[in-house]
Swiss-Prot record:
Gene it is expressed from: tyrS
Keywords linked to the UniProt accession: Aminoacyl-tRNA synthetase, ATP-binding, Cytoplasm, Ligase, Nucleotide-binding, Protein biosynthesis, RNA-binding
Catalytic activity: tRNA(Tyr) + L-tyrosine + ATP = L-tyrosyl-tRNA(Tyr) + AMP + diphosphate + H(+)
Protein name: Tyrosine--tRNA ligase
UniProt motif 'KMSKS' region: location: 235-239
Record-stated family: Belongs to the class-I aminoacyl-tRNA synthetase family. TyrS type 1 subfamily.
Length: 424
């Protein structure tokens, strides 16, 4: 892939939702190595799968000699981005945000290279420049360039204003100015000319481009990647129960792997283009030679690729052992050492100290959202204990459910498992 075809490559991989001044940007990339950035607000102690796509976009640029800059929103995380948020975010302390930042920094090295010379990836924190800004100076020098008329008609703001139960605070409303200033600051200090973000960031990116034009008389550019959602409207990276994190202590490698195995059949080839570095010709060959009934083999390629990227090859091999055991259906043939291996390999598990109510255990093991949800699954024959359907909603697990006096395999449907480990 040559530099002059980078934007075309992005388009062929469905990686561009919107782009500014496409012809100019293509010409710049043809003749120059640039610095570009993507911002991440620090709202938790781990990245999640929704962050993978923009990070891989930065990596594609870095592979061609461009310098990626990661902006950690240590400052803006204290405010909260209202973009496509229905409710105002809880504000976190400076100390907590700093602790989270340290954990996230380690995860970034999974995607970007920090020791390759001229185009080393760089991490910056906007708290470092916002902490010393005088509010009067900011409003006079920066605020005067923003039109309330333009800001208030943006979709994200309108959605919040129209909610009778939840408006928008000035704190969140001002976020647009802060992100625009980020782009201006990075352009001035590091010659960053391109910002990448999710499609929900388009308005903020345009504000930054306008601010650079007004204050620097220079051109800057923006690309947004698609904001992926599932068929039910849920944001990509979330299941019906929780978020899929990159931290193995928050989401087990097995659960991470299964998330990709469970994507819609209609998404698989698009996701291979977007989330892997397989060539487009390789992906086309897969599509041309794979029967509709064999799509799980293609999902396996995607799941193993991303699990290896985030968790490493050892975890992939461990997951292969788990899936081989679980989906063979031959639980009666499993040895005690096999169950122990499942526990060690990262299969979701919970400790059980005495007999347990099935509804309660389904909730505790995160196989159900609530006891009422658990009850409906049980009576609809969706719950199995050691691969045997249990449709009594008041069932109490007891000694006869133990295998080797210690293990019970609880499942919801065909793909969701939890290992109950009884303690003596």
């Amino acid at each position: 892939m040559l530099t002059d075809t980078l934007i075309q490559e992005f388009q062929d991989r469905n990686l561009i939702s919107q782009i500014t001044n496409e012809i100019d940007l293509k010409n710049i990339l043809l003749h120059n190595k640039i610095s570009l950035y993507c911002g991440f607000d620090i709202t938790a102690d781990s990245l999640h799968v929704g962050h993978i796509l923009p990070l891989l976009c930065l990596r594609r640029f870095q592979n061609l000699g461009h310098r990626p800059v990661i902006l950690m929103g240590g400052g803006t995380s204290l405010i909260g981005d209202p973009s496509f948020k229905l409710l105002e975010r809880q504000l976190n302390s400076i100390e907590l945000v700093h602790t989270w930042k340290q954990k996230i920094t380690k995860q970034l090295s999974l995607f970007l290279k920090f020791n390759v010379g001229k185009n080393n990836a760089l991490i910056v924190d906007n708290y470092e420049w916002f902490k010393n800004i005088n509010v009067l100076t900011f409003l006079r020098d920066i605020g005067k360039h923003f039109s309330i008329n333009q800001m208030i008609v943006r979709d994200a703001i309108q959605r919040r204003i129209k909610r009778l139960d939840q408006g928008i605070s000035f704190t969140e409303f001002s976020y647009n100015l802060l992100q625009a200033y980020d782009f201006y600051f990075l352009n001035k200090q590091l010659d960053v000319i391109l910002q990448i973000g999710g499609s929900d960031q388009w308005g903020n990116i345009i504000s930054g481009i306008d601010l650079i034009r007004r204050l620097h008389k220079k051109r800057a550019y923006g690309i947004t990647v698609p904001l992926l959602t599932k068929k039910d409207g849920r944001k990509f990276g979330k299941t019906e129960l929780d978020t899929i994190w990159l931290d193995k202590m928050k989401t087990s490698p097995y659960k991470f792997y299964q998330y990709w195995m469970n994507i819609s059949d209609s998404d698989i080839y698009s996701f291979l283009k977007m989330f892997t570095f397989l060539s487009l010709s390789e992906i086309k060959a897969l599509k041309d030679t794979t029967k509709p009934t064999e799509l799980n083999s293609v999902k396996k390629i995607l799941a193993e690729y991303l699990t290896n990227l985030v968790h490493g090859s050892n975890e992939v091999r461990a997951i292969q052992r788990i899936t081989s055991s679980l989906f063979s259906g031959k639980f009666s043939e499993m040895k005690e050492t096999d169950f122990f291996q499942l526990e060690q390999d990262g299969m979701p598990s919970v400790q059980l100290y005495n007999s347990g109510n099935l509804q309660q255990l389904l909730v505790y093991s995160r196989l159900a959202l609530s006891r009422s949800h658990a009850k409906s699954m049980i009576v609809s024959n969706s719950v199995r204990i050691n691969n045997i359907i249990q449709n009594n909603p008041f069932y109490i697990l007891c000694n006869r459910d133990k295998m080797y006096h210690k293990y019970t395999l609880l499942s919801r449907g065909k793909k969701n498992f939890c290992l109950l480990c009884w303690t003596k």
